């Protein structure tokens, strides 16, 4: 449910990957998946944050609504977005492509590979550091948002996807 009856929020975004990671966690901890309360975050070209308990994905902040990512623009201030679209001269198709594959790190830094961004940071690029740190902060905020849904009663936060291997980001 959203603030406009004509627009619904979709429960899409890396569901197979995050569910598999949650089930792996359950197996490794000798638990039933249905008995786990987890937040699972997919950190790839898009970023999604899921709350999983009772044997299902109970809530999701998808890659359209959540933090910006290597390629996704993520959630944006609505009025600014509408104004930008109106003034840009882009078609709806062009705007959707920009949001899905030319946003995030691509829009700010021209690259979609977090390893390249980390090299930029190692080489002293303060702008790259600002953008990458902002992306990490946005992920942390969305994890907190999902945790608040269950009053913080979470047994683990699981990170998956390529960026999950980054010591800098995680």
Describe the predicted segments one by one.
Residues 1-4:
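Short beta-strand-loop/turn "lid" adjacent to the catalytic site in phosphate-handling enzymes
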Residues 7-35, 45, 58-114, 119:
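Glycine-rich phosphate-binding loop plus the immediately following alpha-helix
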Residues 32-36, 151-154:
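Short helix-loop-beta connector
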Residues 38-42:
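Short glycine-aspartate micro-motif
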Residues 47-52:
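Short beta-strand scaffold segments in enzyme catalytic cores
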Residues 55:
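Short acidic-hydrophobic catalytic motif
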Residues 97-152:
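Adenine-nucleotide phosphate-binding core of ATP-dependent small-molecule kinases
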Residues 154-170:
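Glycine-rich phosphate-binding loops at beta-strand->alpha-helix junctions
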């Amino acid at each position: 449910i959203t603030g406009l009856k004509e627009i619904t929020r979709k429960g899409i975004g890396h569901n197979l990957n995050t569910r598999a990671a949650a089930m792996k966690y359950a197996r490794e901890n000798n638990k039933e998946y249905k008995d786990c309360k987890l937040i699972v975050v997919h950190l790839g070209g898009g970023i999604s944050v899921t709350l999983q308990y009772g044997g299902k994905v109970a809530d999701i902040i998808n890659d359209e609504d959540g933090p910006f990512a290597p390629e996704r623009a993520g959630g944006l201030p609505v009025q600014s977005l509408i104004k930008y679209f109106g003034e840009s001269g882009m078609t709806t198709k062009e705007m959707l492509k920009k949001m899905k594959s030319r946003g995030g790190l691509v829009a700010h830094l021209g690259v979609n590979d977090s390893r390249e961004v980390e090299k930029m940071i190692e080489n002293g690029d303060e702008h790259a550091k600002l953008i990458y740190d902002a992306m990490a902060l946005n992920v942390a905020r969305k994890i907190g948002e999902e945790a608040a849904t269950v009053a913080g009663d979470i047994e683990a936060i699981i990170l998956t996807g390529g960026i999950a291997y980054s010591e800098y980001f995680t």
